[in-house]
Design a protein with these regions (language model features):
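Carbohydrate-active catalytic/glycan-binding domains of CAZyme proteins
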Residues: 1-315
Length: 315
């Protein structure tokens, strides 16, 4: 009998699942939407922690084994817009740690509602652990396509232009459905692109016909590579890639999308794979993402052996 490699199910090309996923502890409850940065010889992971409605921090060296969680930013019920905070991006710049995050306000009675409002907030830290936030959001939903929700900021510092660049998701409350773009000189005052949204669902691709959201942008080889979630419907999601010369226009989708989709029956990520974060380390590409089974999301690791992820882009 031929044995099937279960780590390869739902993975394109040289991608595979780490065999002992999920990588964060079960007793932490639901964790999701991570940012990973390298500081010296250590990796720092910032994550959304569902049971506390907070953003937490862990450290490690190999991308698999992590320290205990430390909450770095908690909800602030006095501001009126961040009863729940999550979906963060953290940059280290000029000796400071800069964080943009999603603040959510639920409308109506009950702990979880199907409607609400979300904005993007900003905080700074000297050590990456103790953050001081601005009281007001730095970006709010204003345009028709944004509806009442902005989420999932991804920010890069453009050294050549001396400017911050943000890609963000907007639209639906639980899962924003399109991706927009904005620029800022100080990371606080943002100007949205006049042609937003810059990236939309593709109705001819069943795996991303409903929603595209929560991207990471990775500059490489003269392109801006976008790793993003594509939704077939509200419950089934995959990881996909597109690229653009300027990160705004002319997006070209990877012809072998999706690169990651649900795992084998009964596995922790059988129904959906969400919110990618990719990093190159030791001759491999590491991609952390949320997997979902039933209503539970957990963070796992996917590995690409070899340096060239897209050698078959034009095949």
């Amino acid at each position: 009998m031929i044995e099937q490699d279960l780590t390869k199910i739902g993975c394109h090309g040289n991608w595979r699942r780490y065999k002992n996923n999920p990588i964060l502890k079960d007793d932490w409850g639901e964790t999701f939407d991570v940012t990973v940065i390298q500081v010296g010889e250590k990796l720092r992971m910032y994550l959304s922690w569902r049971s506390t409605n907070s953003i937490a921090f862990v450290e490690g060296v190999d991308g698999v084994h992590w320290s205990e969680t430390v909450i770095v930013l908690s909800p602030d019920f006095t501001t009126g817009w961040e009863d729940d905070i999550n979906r963060q991006i953290v940059l280290e710049k000029d000796g400071k740690y800069l964080m943009w995050y999603t603040g959510m306000k639920f409308l109506g009675a009950g702990e979880r509602m199907s409607s609400g409002r979300s904005c993007i907030g900003y905080a700074e830290s000297e050590d990456g652990i103790h953050f001081t936030r601005r009281k007001d959001p730095v970006m709010e939903p204003e345009e028709a396509w944004e509806k009442t929700n902005l989420m999932c900021p991804h920010v890069l510092w453009d050294e050549e232009r001396n400017i911050f660049r943000m890609w963000y998701s907007a639209g639906g409350f639980w899962e924003p459905d399109q991706i927009g773009y904005a620029e800022s000189e100080d990371g606080i005052h943002w100007k949205k692109h006049p042609q937003n949204p810059i990236f939309r669902p593709e109705p001819t691709h069943f795996w991303e016909k409903e929603i595209v959201s929560a991207c990471q942008i990775f500059p490489m080889d003269g392109y801006y590579y976008m790793f993003y979630i594509g939704f077939e419907d509200m419950y089934k999601a995959t990881i996909n890639v597109a690229r653009s010369k300027d990160g705004i226009e002319g997006w070209e989708r990877y012809p072998h999308n999706p690169i990651l989709s649900g795992g084998p029956e009964g596995s922790w990520d059988v129904e959906a794979v969400y919110k990618p974060w990719v990093m190159h380390m030791d001759g491999q590409w590491l991609l952390w993402a949320n997997g979902r089974r039933a209503a539970v999301e957990q963070v796992g690791l996917y590995i690409h052996d070899g340096d060239n992820m897209f050698e078959d882009w034009n095949d």
